[in-house]
Amino acid sequence: TGNVQNMSRMFYGCSCLQELEVRNFDTSNAKDMSWMFYGCNQLQELDIRNFDTSKAQTMIGMFYGCSQLQELDIRNFDTGNVQNMSRMFSGCNHLQELDIRNFDISNVQNMSWMFHDCSRLKVLDVRSFDTSNVEETLGMFSLCNQLQKLDVRNFNVSNIKNMSYMFSGCCYIDRFQGIEQLKK
């Protein structure tokens, strides 16, 4: 798989798939990883720790609808070239934690519905997010209804055009840091 540049929809709609061995995939040239695992709603685990995402430009809906995934180790993802992360984790409603602290989103323009319906996430650390190029955050955290803490103090909203439904349904947040001081 080392020469593959487009991995979009590779396992799209594989709704009966319970196990998937992609640990040794060579993703070093992949630019498009959109909808890669979309609708794999029976997968409970997915080992992608070794994925080289350094050339990836789009991750739209990459894990959308992976509703049985209980954990996802993406700590090593290099997201420095990614421009679109919309719906990336949307519908991953069994994930209880997601470590995205190392995500470089400095080139991302669209984060719409990124965590939509991640209804079991309790904490999401987005403090390091450089949102200065982001234009869309529509529904970004909507229906994350178990989320208890969210720190958006470093969010720069100067280029954001649409924030509709951004926090809609986040009914358990008791510590909402930085909402009053979103950078303009």
Regions found by a protein language model. Name each.
Residues 1-184:
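Negatively charged
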